Amino acid sequence: PQCESETNFHYDIPPGYKDDVLVDVNNMSPSLVSDTQKHERGSHEVKIKHFSPYIAVCVTTFSLAFCCFMVHAAITRQPTHLLPFFFIQVFDLIICLIHILGFMSSTSDIRLVIHTKTGPIYIKSTGLTFIILSISCMMLAFKAYCLGMVWDCYKYLMLNRRGNLLDDWYSDQWGHLSTFWSLLRTGRNRGNNSIGNSGSPNEPNTRPRPDTITYDPANDLPKYEDILKIRNAYAPPPYYCSNTNGNVNTTTTDAVTTNTTITSATTANATTTITTNANTNTSTTTSVISPLTTTNKDDTQINNASSNAHSSC
């Protein structure tokens, strides 16, 4: 009786296609149908036994933790806290791509599962492939869009942290990829739809650029390009122009005249001092020579007197 019920159950299943070959379940023997059903039930039970709720709880916990890190990074402007969630998104994108490739390689098995349902749905292989490909492309596009948003947020926080805000900081994003990624970027184009820009979308961005780049010693060392962008980094000293430095020239002339006067006065004083010293030396010499002359005269008189005495004797 059990075999008859199982056989009647399989008799209600409509015929299906597998690998483009007609498989009629009605023409199969009852023993083959029973063995096939037992094998399918056994494989289903093995799949259920291999499922562990602890793994699901761990994956859910880590996902929530990474989401909390992402929210904390966006609020406190910490770009490094976005990296765990970014890596999770990259891993999810790769896993989704592998699943899509697996579905595309087993399209015939999916058609057989659809045909063996209680409510039969007949669909061609081309239509099923198109539906699976469309859904897969939409899923990949959405995941890639979210991944690009997280990466843009990370770059914005890094540039904002360094104090080097640029208008076209995202211009080289996805530049080496195809046009498909450029279409995805239209939704997050901050150049024409930025906050505070009241112009039309076709007008270029008119946000004021920063005049100078300041360097905070508390952060890491600046780049060579940032140093070159600093105003008057290697500028020569200012030149003296005729239209703006006339007073400076006048002051310089007055200073030269004053120096000439001081030099003349110094020269005159030096000349007077030298003359005075010369006169003093002359007087001293005269006074010294006068006693010597007097002494010589006295000696001459003494000598004359002694000679007269000898002659008288």
From Swiss-Prot:
Recorded superkingdom: Eukaryota
Keywords: Cell membrane, Membrane, Phosphoprotein, Receptor, Transmembrane, Transmembrane helix
Record PTM: Phosphorylated on tyrosine residues.
Localization of this protein: Cell membrane
Bilayer disposition of the protein: Multi-pass membrane protein
One cellular-component annotation, GO: plasma membrane
Keyword flag Transmembrane: yes
Residue spans of biased composition, Polar residues class: 301-313
Chain intervals with Low complexity compositional bias: 279-295
Extracellular side: 1-54, 104-129
Transmembrane intervals: 55-75, 83-103, 130-150
Segments for region (Disordered): 192-218, 279-313
Coiled coil ranges: none
Cytoplasmic compartment residues: 76-82, 151-313
Assembly, per entry: Interacts (via N-terminal extracellular domain) with human C2a.
Function: Cell surface receptor that binds to human complement C2a protein. This results in inhibition of the classical and lectin pathways of complement activation, probably due to interference with binding of C2a to C4b and interference with cleavage by C1 or MASP2 such that C3 convertase cannot be formed. This infers resistance to complement-mediated cell lysis, allowing parasite survival and infection.
Miscellaneous: Specifically and strongly recognized by a serum from baboons vaccinated with irradiated parasite. Potential vaccine candidate molecule.
UniProt name for this protein: Tetraspanning orphan receptor
